[in-house]
Each structure stands twice: as structure tokens, then as C-alpha cells.
Amino acid sequence: MFVSLWEFFYGHFFRFWMKWLLRQMTGKCELQRIFDTYGGAQRTYRIENSLTYSKNKVLQNATRVAQSELDRCIANIMKEKNICSEKDTSFQICMRTCLLQITGYKQLYHDVENVRKKPYDSANAQHEKMLLKLWSLLMPTKKLTARISKQWADIGFQGDDPKTDFRGMGILGLINLVYFSENYTSEAHQILSRSNHPKLGYSYAIVGINLTEMAYSLLKSEALKLHLYNFVPGVPTMEHFHQFYCYLVYEFDKFWLEEEPESIMYFNLYREKFHERIKGLLMDCNAVLTLKT
């Protein structure tokens, strides 16, 4: 109740008068003051909040503007806020960077979601080719005897046909597994080998798909904003999402071995512990979580 009242008074009264007072004192609007004071993710995050909670429709709509309309949008913001480009020469550049990151994050979520919604289809030649590529990347010296085979368990799938394991994350789970195996082949082989440990082993592919779900949920909840705003000086793309996934795979393997779980039966418990650790790291305004090998 108290929190709700504070949010109401802050949003409707206190924030307005505080902004007005600061503008009178500095001669600059809130957006300009943010650019003068902050850098990196803090700058973009605060600009996003300022635009989102503004009562001005031009500013509100800026967080959803199409990239083709970016320059016009910035010109409209400057007009609304009486900002002279000759007096504040950096405003347009700074605002453009922030809006590319803000709108890019929203687009990235939609792109990831669209891929996630696509189910694995064994009748799709591209899907089948990708699955067989995963096998060849992880088991280069061992031939797969048949498409439906118990051999899939060697790389951590549950049944004879991996397609059933992709139901939750769709083709996104396979794309991530292939991306890590192709771009970090040595690390993938090492992790696969460790996943076969007699006591601390786990199902490599199943855990990989589970970590796709973790990366997706963090993106959806906007927990990845600070990381991506720090890491990408423009529009974040699927490539950056895959890179974050690789970080999770590498770090989870280290975490699992360090924790020495009693058995795989405790996977969900340790998975949640790892999840909380990652969320804590992502709350740091200087967060940049990249795989360092």
C-alpha cells in the first residue's frame, strides 16, 4: 500500500517538480542531464526510463520507433525539449545510440521468440542437416549408424530420436547447441567429456537445451538489458544472444563441477542456484558476461 502510494505521488507530482527545478537550475532537460552524467548501460537504461515514463507522447513513442524513422524521431524529441543542435552537438549522436539499443532489444526478443516457436520438424531437410551437423561436431571420429539410434545418448539426448527433446525450446535449442559446438569446438569437446564423469556427469544436450530456456527467460524478463547495453554499442542481434548462451554453457559446467552435486537428481536445485547467481551478476550496471577461454 505504502509503495503504491509512493509510486503514485512520485510519478504524478514529485518527479515533475524535481525535473522542473533541475531544468531551471541547469538549463538542461532530463535527457541532456543523463547524457552529461552517465555512460554505458546506465545511460541507456535511464534514457529508456525517462522516455517510457514521460507524459509526452513523442517521447513515449520513441522507445518503439522503427530504425528507418530514427532521425525524424530524434528531431521531434529535440523540438519538444527545445534542444538546439548547435549548442548541444552530442545530443543527436547519444540519443541515436540509445534508441538503437532500446528498440534493438525489443526486436531481438521478437526474433528469438519467433525462432523458439518453430518446432523441430524431421521432415525439414534443414533441421535434419543441422542435427546431423551437431553430431559430427561433437563426435568427429564416431559415425552415426542411423538417424534413429541409441547413440544420441552419447551426446546427452534422452531418447533414440532427439526431436522429442526440442519440444520446449523448438529449433532454438538446436541452433544454440550447434552454435556453441561450431564456434567453441574445443570447449564443447571438453565439456562433453566432463559431462560423462561417472559421479558428476549430466546429459550434455538436455542441459544445453535447458540453458537455452534460461537465456530466453532472462531476455524476456529484460534481465539482459544491462549486459547487452554494455556489450553492444548499437543494435543487439541473434549473434549476441548466442554468445550469451555460450557463456551460460561454459559457466554452468564450471559451476556444476565446483558444487559437486550428490547426483543428477538434484539438477533442478543446482540449476536454480546457478540461475540466481547469473541474475545477480546481470544486476551490475557494468555487467558484461562474455565467454573468456
From Swiss-Prot:
Keywords: GTPase activation. Signal peptide: none annotated. The keyword Ribonucleoprotein does not apply. Residues 126-282 form the ELMO domain. One of its GO terms (molecular function) is GTPase activator activity. One of its GO terms (biological process) is regulation of defense response to virus. Pfam families: ELMO_CED12. It comes from the Eukaryota. Acts as a GTPase-activating protein (GAP) toward guanine nucleotide exchange factors like ARL2, ARL3, ARF1 and ARF6, but not for GTPases outside the Arf family. This is ELMO domain-containing protein 2.
